[in-house]
């Protein structure tokens, strides 16, 4: 990290600490004719003041947050610092930038059962080194990105006196632990994560069962059906402009969750996703496909000190991927597997986590995680790559399963992965959490069939060990309004990669919430 920006993390954390001393002592006096006429009942604590400000009337509530991040990484997306191996990203293998995300939201309650929800968001970024992606590629300085209506929906509780909730519009949807449904906008990098959708949640109280039926219509462009605040369109050399996701998407979800047995919560689901290429003239963007996913999840607390979660899913359907199905011969495929049309999908994924809760003074926890996502076999005309659908978010790594998959598949399109290892979590002092994780990472297939043409030299095509992954996270919540964290990740590359260099990722964050 550059010397002049290295103190930023310290400055942010110190400012947060100073900010926390104010609410504890601040009192706000209600409007009176003079200060001397104030009575004890007219003096509010900061918490009371904030509550009254955010809920000025029974028909309105509002709030906001402001997130500041300083992020640095090296080789995470280029996979190597050698331009000969990574000609596009190699020259910009080292990245440092600031992210300033602001959001404000409001809810209107026209009746007891109906709520109108609105949220606006914007995240300008300042690149301290030449930018690595999108319309700002190769530039430094402030990137004044667009603002967007991040949420806009109507929620109707107990429609027609049914034990249900109907939500229509732009909304956040997170099912299970987000493995396959958690983020509808992976291309904007945690700036937003909404899905344009209709969701009906039906509760069978006596059966301890919840049924979710969801329909999705998601566009690649952020201004497709609702204008953005500021330009999000194309610029010379970047005809795609800024994207939310890689293709236009339609989907249907049926998700049933039963919690009758605390030791064995059962989820079963069917997911359908239809992909339609956004720009037919741009091979790297998106795919055409119809993906059908059938899966289930089991989780619970079988004993006082143990908890677990296990999930598995199988996929079928068909997909046409421009990167794989390009005109002419694909260098990654043998002659018998060449195709330019749709391929039948035959893929599956598994994941699990077992945690021991010490329940001691420091709240020690020790977990063992494992995950398998099938990869595409280059020797067949089928598509064996498991698609994580709307799960392209940093589920276990802010670095590897987001940036490092860009040359291999797409942003957050984690696939062809075998991952296992432990995590230790502890709360050494009140409001502070620390965790340390190690994962051994492997590939089921040693040839990344979807690697971008300019990135193929970065892969050895002969090894299956992705590398040793290490993560350390320190979080602290100062109060209800200020929190912060320090985040670090490292990967020592294995023989899956040509150069076998080290990747690293560092972040300092402060979040202000009102």
Feature-to-residue mapping (PLM):
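Exposed, low-structure sequence patches enriched in small/polar residues
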Residues: 408-449, 465, 507
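Signature for the C-terminal beta-barrel architecture of outer-membrane proteins
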Residues: 27, 160-166, 184-380, 427, ...
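Surface-exposed loop and membrane-interface regions of Gram-negative outer-membrane beta-barrel proteins
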Residues: 40, 72-100, 107-162, 175-186, ...
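Flexible glycine-rich, low-complexity coil/linker segments exposed to the extracellular/periplasmic environment
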Residues: 380-416
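N-terminal periplasmic/intermembrane-space "pro-region" immediately following the signal or transit peptide
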Residues: 2-95, 105, 109-111, 362-366, ...
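Conserved C-terminal beta-signal and adjacent last beta-strands/turns
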Residues: 153, 422, 435, 467-477, ...
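Active/binding-pocket-proximal capping segment
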Residues: 385-389, 438-444, 450-456, 490-492
């Amino acid at each position: 990290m550059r010397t002049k920006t290295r103190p930023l993390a310290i400055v942010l954390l110190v400012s947060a600490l100073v900010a926390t001393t104010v609410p504890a002592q601040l009192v706000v006096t209600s409007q009176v004719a003079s200060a001397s006429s104030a009575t004890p009942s007219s003096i509010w604590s900061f918490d009371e003041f904030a509550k009254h400000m955010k809920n000025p009337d029974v028909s309105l509530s509002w709030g906001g947050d402001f997130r500041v991040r300083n992020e640095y990484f090296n080789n995470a997306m280029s996979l190597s610092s050698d331009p000969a191996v990574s000609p596009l990203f190699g020259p910009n293998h080292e990245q440092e930038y600031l992210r300033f995300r602001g959001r404000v939201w409001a809810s209107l309650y026209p009746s007891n059962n109906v709520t109108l929800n609105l949220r606006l968001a914007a995240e300008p970024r300042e690149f301290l080194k030449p930018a690595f992606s999108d319309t700002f590629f190769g530039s430094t300085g402030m990137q004044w990105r667009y603002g967007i209506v991040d949420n806009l929906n109507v929620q109707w509780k107990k429609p027609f006196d049914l034990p249900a909730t109907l939500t229509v519009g732009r909304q956040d949807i997170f099912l299970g632990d987000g493995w396959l449904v958690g983020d509808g906008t992976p291309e904007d990098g945690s700036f937003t994560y909404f899905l344009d959708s209709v969701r009906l949640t039906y509760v069978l109280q006596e059966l301890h069962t919840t049924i979710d039926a969801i329909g999705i219509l998601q566009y690649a462009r952020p201004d497709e059906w609702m204008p953005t605040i500021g330009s999000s369109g194309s610029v010379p050399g970047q005809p795609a402009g800024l994207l939310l996701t890689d293709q236009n998407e339609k989907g249907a979800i049926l998700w049933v969750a039963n919690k009758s047995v605390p030791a064995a919560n059962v989820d079963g689901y069917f997911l359908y996703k239809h992909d339609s290429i956004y720009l037919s003239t741009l091979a790297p963007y998106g795919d055409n496909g119809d993906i059908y996913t059938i899966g289930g999840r089991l989780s619970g607390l079988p004993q006082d000190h143990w908890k677990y979660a296990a999930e598995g899913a199988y996929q079928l359907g068909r997909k046409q991927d421009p990167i794989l199905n390009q005109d002419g011969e694909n260098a990654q495929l043998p002659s018998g597997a060449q195709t330019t049309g749709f391929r039948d999908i035959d893929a599956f994924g598994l994941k699990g986590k077992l945690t021991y809760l010490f329940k001691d003074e420091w709240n020690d926890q020790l977990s063992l995680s494992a995950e398998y996502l099938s990869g595409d076999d280059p020797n067949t005309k089928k598509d064996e790559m498991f698609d994580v659908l709307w799960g392209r978010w940093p589920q276990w790594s802010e670095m590897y399963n987001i940036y490092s998959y860009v040359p291999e598949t797409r942003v957050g399109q984690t696939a062809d992965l075998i991952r296992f290892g432990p995590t230790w979590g502890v709360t050494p002092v009140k409001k502070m959490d620390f965790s340390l994780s190690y994962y051994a990472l492997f590939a089921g297939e040693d040839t990344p069939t979807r690697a971008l043409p300019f990135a193929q030299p970065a892969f050895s095509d002969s090894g299956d060990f992705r590398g040793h992954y290490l993560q350390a996270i320190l979080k602290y919540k100062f109060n209800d309004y200020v929190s912060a964290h320090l985040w670090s990740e490292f990967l020592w590359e294995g023989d899956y990669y040509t150069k076998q260099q080290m990747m690293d990722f560092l972040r300092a964050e402060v979040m202000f919430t009102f």
